[in-house]
């Protein structure tokens, strides 16, 4: 069985590389399918997490997004990573993002299996259950960075702007209303037809989610105050593939 797995591995590496490059908009210089991927053992995953500061993890994500948006993702042996991480996990960051199919965090940040915790919900809102998951990721599993990632043209944001009512979705969209109400001074209609308004609400929603995480979790707030973690926000642009990190004031030291 191991022999059969090894025969498929080069094809998986190449297919994954080409797939990510295609998603990112492609560059004129794609990675060669013969490039040798980094093969980390579990100790390497653990070392990377333990020795990284929150600032270094943030820089790692930024560099990964640059590779993705430029169409130059790192080659990966996903079968190897899957086998290695079956014995444990040491993700460096936890990403709270929308369920939108066009915004997968591992691709956007050019990360691999075992590198990120993912918490996904329409509109990337922060509720008690999701914040509890972040507490596990950081306090128990050792992640150094919490990222709230919104994105452009978000359907949940548009729904909140239009005050859509639809079953259980109604209650979820109500949680975005504070962001809608926060946005002032944008010219034009205050609904989904006005994309400038929609994007302003998306950013306000990210800011409020970061604030909400600190309010709901004394654990995470304390860890941030002690520089053990950082909590940041960003917006992913569906058209360019690039992430823009938002300047949000950190918890006072």
Label for each model-derived stretch:
Residues 14-24:
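Bacterial N-terminal signal peptides
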Residues 26-88, 114, 123-141, 158-253:
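Divalent-metal-activated hydrolytic enzyme cores
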Residues 92, 142-145:
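Loop/turn elements at helix/coil->beta-strand transitions in domains of secreted/extracellular proteins
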Residues 97-102, 122-125, 151:
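Short glycine-enriched loops at secondary-structure junctions
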Residues 109-118:
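Short helix-loop-beta junction
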């Amino acid at each position: 069985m191991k022999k059969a797995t090894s025969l498929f591995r080069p094809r998986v590496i190449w297919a994954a590389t080409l797939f990510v490059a295609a998603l990112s908009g492609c560059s004129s210089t794609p990675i060669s399918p013969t490039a040798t991927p980094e093969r980390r053992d579990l100790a390497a995953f653990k070392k990377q997490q333990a020795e990284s500061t929150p600032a270094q993890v943030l820089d790692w994500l930024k560099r990964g997004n640059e590779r993705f948006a430029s169409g130059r993702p790192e080659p990966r042996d996903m079968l190897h990573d899957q086998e290695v991480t079956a014995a444990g996990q040491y993700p460096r960051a936890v990403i709270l993002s929308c369920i939108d199919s066009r915004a997968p965090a591992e691709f956007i940040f050019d990360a691999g299996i075992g590198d990120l915790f993912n918490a996904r919900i329409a509109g990337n809102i922060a509720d008690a259950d999701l914040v509890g998951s972040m507490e596990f990721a950081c306090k128990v599993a050792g992640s150094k960075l919490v990222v709230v990632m919104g994105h452009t043209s978000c359907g949940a944001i548009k729904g909140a702007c239009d005050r859509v009512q639809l079953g259980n979705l109604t209650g979820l969209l109500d949680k975005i209303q504070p962001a809608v109400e926060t946005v002032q001074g944008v010219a034009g209609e205050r609904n989904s037809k006005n994309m400038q308004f929609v994007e302003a609400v998306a950013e306000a929603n990210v800011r409020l989610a970061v604030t909400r995480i600190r309010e709901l979790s004394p654990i995470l707030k304390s860890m941030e105050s002690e520089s053990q973690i950082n909590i940041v926000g960003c917006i992913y642009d569906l058209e360019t593939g690039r992430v823009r990190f938002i300047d949000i004031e950190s918890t006072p030291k």
